[in-house]
């Protein structure tokens, strides 16, 4: 018997999301207009809380859908206007270009990145050195490339290697289902569990590495570019201003990587089983023999384009998104990717998040129009200038650990800049606050997958169920990094940021917003 029209519509609404989630969103949409009529300020905060809820529940439904419905309703009932949303989007065009073109550009360099991580995995036998190498490589790449893409590449390597060994262990060849362990004998299962633990630890080290590197440069994370634009900083300025906090944090993060591997704490310390290494080495040897001269030329071309990318970013030869577009053009033209559909695949990772970011800007428009953060900012600005840095860092860190850090960073930098323009804080203090906001947004957000887009991408990837990486396990394995990064970042904001910035300014290293 066919279901009723109402039931059919209910099933279509937000698809496979749980019924309680659908019901919660409907309640939000129904009550918001009435609360807005009664008290716009409370309604505005309720909208922000609802939007953060959709971000926290990203595994139930991609936030673009529920968040977009809330944003559309907010415009319709007058919490903000379509014109203001357009202004916010226009003001952040560089960030949208970054997501559209830079992420797509790096897609065409995946072969080179796969080659790098494969060589690391098979060349280094010490697990501690290998973990450190993955963390450093991910940090370096994330300083210039998109963290999502770096994690996507490491996932590709891990899935590929897992599949190779799983086929051998199950003796099922190409028909093998990687999620099915029923055909694997007990001996192989023990080795497979050890291999899973090994891959889990490598993925977490690489994921944290993207956060360590991503905080250091203006292109490492989308919110960095928003903050850099608000402060008027270019690539070199941004790196130098962040360095009093980010360099000590990087060093301590790498020491944490070595410590948890050495002590086998928090689920780390598993080594690559020799039987697995033999299988993977044999497969890699066969792949290298099959590599043609044309394939080798592609790797060389991608390496040269990588040099161009780093140089163009460092010298600020063009807007970040346009540099990304140049990477797309050069990489496709010189490696022979000419089919429209093949090029289109490069944009599938970035466009959903680009659309979600546009919804963020709608919520930011509501926050500005309803003056939602005015009480918080007034509270912070009443403190001493020294205490303001700590408070901004902590408020950003708390919100970023449960919500998306792009959203949080955008809100706070807008409020800090408004305070400067209104004369509430000096230019010098604003520039220090921008560093506190950026580091507070990036570092504590490793606590949960909700804060870091790269972590969320890993959790929702095809790899997570294969290596038994659940939400809880990810939070547990991230805990030592969360504690170290947050505390060292806080201490640096408190004690080293102001004197180091003053010294660099006097030395003539830093440009100042005019």
Curated annotation (Swiss-Prot):
Report TM segments: 23-43, 63-83, 97-117, 120-140, 144-164, 202-222, 238-258, 303-323, 357-377, 391-411, 447-467, 475-495
Its membrane topology: Multi-pass membrane protein
* GO MF entry, a single one: sodium:proton antiporter activity
Q: Which reaction does it catalyse?
A: 2 Na(+)(in) + 3 H(+)(out) = 2 Na(+)(out) + 3 H(+)(in)
Name of the featured protein: Na(+)/H(+) antiporter NhaB
Which InterPro entries does the record match to this protein?
A: Na+/H+_antiporter_NhaB (IPR004671)
Name the domain of life this protein comes from: Bacteria
Write out the annotated subcellular location.
Cell inner membrane
Location, primary (coarse class): membrane
Question: Which gene is the coding source of this polypeptide chain?
Answer: nhaB
């Amino acid at each position: 018997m066919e279901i009723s029209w109402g039931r059919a519509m209910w099933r279509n609404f937000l698809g496979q999301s749980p019924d309680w989630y659908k019901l919660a969103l409907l309640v939000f949409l129904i009550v918001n207009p009435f609360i807005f009529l009664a008290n716009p300020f409370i309604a505005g905060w309720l909208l922000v809380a609802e939007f953060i809820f959709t971000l926290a529940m990203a595994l139930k439904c991609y936030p673009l859908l529920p968040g977009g419905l809330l944003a559309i309703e907010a415009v319709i009932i007058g919490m903000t206007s379509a014109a203001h949303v357009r202004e916010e989007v226009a003001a952040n065009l560089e960030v949208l270009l970054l997501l559209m073109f830079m992420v797509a550009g790096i897609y065409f360099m995946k072969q080179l990145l796969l080659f790098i991580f494969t060589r690391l995995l098979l060349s280094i036998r010490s697990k501690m050195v290998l973990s450190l190498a993955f963390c450093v490589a991910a940090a370096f790449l994330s300083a210039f490339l998109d963290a999502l893409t770096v994690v996507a590449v490491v996932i590709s390597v891990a899935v590929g290697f897992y599949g190779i060994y799983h086929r051998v262990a199950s003796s099922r060849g190409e028909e093998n289902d990687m999620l099915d362990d029923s055909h694997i004998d007990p001996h192989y299962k023990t080795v497979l569990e050890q291999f899973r633990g090994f891959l889990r630890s490598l993925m977490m080290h690489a994921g944290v590495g993207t956060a360590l590197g991503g905080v250091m440069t203006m292109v490492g994370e989308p919110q960095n570019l928003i903050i850099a634009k608000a402060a008027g900083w270019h690539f070199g300025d941004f790196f130098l201003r962040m360095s009093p906090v980010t360099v000590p944090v990087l060093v301590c993060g790498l020491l944490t990587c070595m410590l948890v591997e050495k002590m086998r704490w928090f689920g780390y310390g598993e080594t690559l089983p020799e039987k697995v290494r033999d299988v993977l080495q044999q497969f890699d040897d066969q792949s290298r023999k099959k590599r043609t001269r044309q394939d080798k030329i592609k790797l060389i071309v991608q390496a040269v384009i990588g040099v161009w990318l780093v140089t163009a970013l460092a010298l600020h030869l063009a807007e970040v998104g346009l540099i990304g577009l140049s990477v797309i053009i050069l990489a496709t033209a010189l490696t022979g990717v000419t089919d429209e559909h093949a090029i289109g695949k490069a944009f599938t990772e970035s466009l959903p998040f680009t659309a979600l970011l546009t919804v963020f800007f709608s919520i930011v428009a509501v926050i500005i129009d309803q003056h939602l953060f005015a009480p918080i900012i007034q509270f912070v600005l009443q403190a001493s200038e020294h205490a303001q840095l700590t408070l901004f860092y902590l408020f950003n860190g708390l919100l970023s650990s449960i919500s998306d850090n792009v959203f949080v960073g955008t809100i706070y930098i807008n409020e800090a800049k408004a305070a400067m323009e209104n004369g509430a804080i000096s230019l010098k203090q604003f520039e220090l606050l921008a560093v506190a906001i950026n580091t507070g947004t990036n570092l504590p957000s490793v606590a949960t997958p909700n804060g870091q887009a790269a972590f969320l991408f890993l959790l929702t990837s095809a790899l997570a169920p294969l290596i038994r990486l659940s939400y809880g396990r990810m939070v547990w394995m991230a805990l030592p990094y969360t504690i170290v990064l947050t505390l060292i970042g806080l201490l640096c904001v408190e004690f080293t940021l102001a004197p180091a910035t003053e010294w660099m300014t006097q030395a003539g290293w830093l440009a100042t917003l005019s």
